[in-house]
Regions:
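Polyanion-binding surface elements
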Residues: 1-23
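Short helix-start
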Residues: 8-10, 34-57
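Major-groove DNA-recognition helix of helix-turn-helix-type DNA-binding domains
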Residues: 16-43
Length: 57
């Protein structure tokens, strides 16, 4: 199974990007970040964040 450190909450992702949770949700909606829905909460895949940074830096 997936270890906890491989997925981040929207809040943790926002902190990592130094942005707002609203912006993170927008990125998920735009499919800029790979995320999975867990109940009513989004979980962002850490691997996807690293990919995003590599493409955008």
């Amino acid at each position: 199974g997936m270890r906890n450190d491989e997925i981040l909450t929207v809040k943790e992702t926002a902190a990592l990007f130094k942005t707002t949770r609203q912006q993170v949700r927008k990125m998920i909606a735009n499919e800029e970040l790979p995320a999975v829905k867990v109940g009513r909460e989004w979980r962002v895949l850490r691997a996807g964040i690293m990919e995003f940074f590599e493409e955008n830096l």
